[in-house]
Regions:
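Alpha/beta-hydrolase fold nucleophile elbow
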Residues: 98-108
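Conserved alpha/beta-hydrolase "acid-adjacent" motif
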Residues: 160-166
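Gly/Ala-rich beta-loop-alpha elbow adjacent to hydrolase catalytic centers
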Residues: 108-112, 116
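Short beta-strand/loop motif that positions the catalytic acidic residue
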Residues: 152-155, 159
Length: 208
């Protein structure tokens, strides 16, 4: 079995190590979230994936976004396909790097966070932890399969790319489906400031 994704990694010398998967945002690349890999648990294998769609040099997307006038839309079918592909290829990384299949965490930012929610809700409890930064739940990517994933959500109250209200709507969806989560807001735009970074790292170290 091989993977179709380009990725960079930081591997653990420990057998049966936890696996942390990093999913970057729209227009970014695999180097973005990997920049704080040194802050993540030392015994974990860390895989940072590059999204498959090239927008321009060093800029990639998991699925296309387009506008109809002022209305933002996205390629629903493309998003569902990449979600399923990521779920299917989890086993490749587990086997190649001798990881613990019961200790998989996803850290996603923006479009990567949206995908992370979709993966968690469609993967039959494959994911132990999800850190969803500056994203939201997209209903068309949900299957609402039963799972026990721990979820951390954060959003900047001044986010100009994905409005803060998207996370409020996400919380309502999760509440309506009796899904537990931790939600924190920060005085920031579309990004992760030091307070946000410390917050999700503290949470992840307790959970992973």
């Amino acid at each position: 079995m091989e993977t179709s994704f380009f990725y960079i990694q930081k591997t653990s010398s420990k057998r049966n190590a936890p696996l942390i998967l990093l999913l970057h945002g729209y227009g970014s690349n695999e180097e973005d979230l990997f920049s704080f890999s040194r802050l993540l648990p030392k015994d974990a294998t860390i895989i940072s994936l590059r999204a498959p769609l090239s927008l321009f040099p060093n800029s990639y997307a998991w699925y296309n976004i387009y506008y109809d006038g002022s209305v933002k839309n996205y390629d629903i079918e493309g998003a569902q396909k990449i979600r399923d592909k990521l779920i299917d290829e989890l086993d490749y990384f587990i086997e190649k790097y001798n990881c613990d299949s019961k200790r998989i965490s996803i850290i996603g930012f923006s479009q990567g966070a949206i995908l992370g929610h979709g993966i968690v809700q469609c993967s039959n409890s494959k994911i132990k932890n999800l850190v969803a930064l500056s994203g939201y739940v997209e209903k068309d990517l949900l299957c609402m399969k039963k799972n026990s994933c721990s979820i951390y959500i954060s959003h900047g109250i001044n986010d100009e790319v994905i409005p803060y209200n998207e996370s409020i709507e996400t919380n309502k969806i999760l509440d309506d489906n009796n899904i537990d989560y931790v939600f924190e807001s920060f005085d920031q735009g579309h990004g992760v400031n030091q307070e946000n970074l410390k917050s999700f790292l503290d949470w992840l170290y307790k959970k992973y």
